[in-house]
């Protein structure tokens, strides 16, 4: 990756997606001050198998988005209240981000000290989440995003070597 947060070729209708999702209740996250709601569920391995839309989110707009993205993992609406941010962290899988509402909100790469604005601009962005980062809302309204995990791939070791470690006497 050149950057932590890059625009993809995928154009979306963020207004239509926001309208489609607006009538759903979000739950308070037990780990932080954010509100979140999964829009799909896992029927297999959390990190490796494609997730399916929950019936209440299985609409033509969401089906179209999922077709554009291909098989994906967990997808959730995340609301970051004004004046709040996430703890610094890194994740194991990359994620797509679609901003549905934002006002002076940023994803911040803490390794390079770069800030990326989260704009409601009808584009899907790809984020390299293995970098130490945070999301911060410096604005006066909630930052709402649809965040979608990319699936991990199974890797096959080429020419593995076995070693045995024994304690010294």
Task: Label the predicted regions.
Residues 99-120:
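A short beta-strand-loop-beta hairpin characteristic of the jelly-roll/cupin
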Residues 96-99, 124-126, 140-158:
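A short hydrophobic beta-strand segment most commonly corresponding to one strand
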Residues 79, 90-106:
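Short, conserved beta-strand element in jelly-roll/cupin
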Residues 160-169:
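Fe(II)/2-oxoglutarate
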Residues 117-121, 128-130, 135, 146-150:
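Conserved SAM-binding loop
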């Amino acid at each position: 990756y050149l950057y932590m947060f890059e625009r993809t070729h995928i154009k979306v209708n963020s207004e239509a997606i926001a309208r489609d999702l607006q009538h759903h209740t979000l739950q308070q996250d037990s780990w932080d001050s954010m509100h979140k709601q999964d829009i799909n569920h896992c029927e297999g391995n959390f990190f490796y198998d494609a997730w399916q839309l929950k019936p209440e989110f299985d609409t033509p707009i969401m089906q179209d988005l999922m077709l554009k993205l291909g098989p994906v993992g967990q997808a959730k609406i995340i609301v970051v209240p004004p004046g709040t941010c996430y703890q610094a962290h890194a994740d194991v899988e990359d994620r797509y981000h679609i901003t549905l509402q934002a006002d002076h909100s940023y994803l911040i790469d803490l390794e390079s000290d770069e800030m990326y604005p989260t704009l409601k601009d009808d584009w899907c962005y790809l984020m390299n989440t293995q970098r130490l980062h945070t999301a911060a809302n410096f604005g006066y309204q909630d930052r709402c995003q649809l965040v979608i995990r990319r699936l991990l791939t199974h890797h096959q070791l080429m020419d593995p070597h076995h070693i045995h470690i024994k304690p010294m006497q």
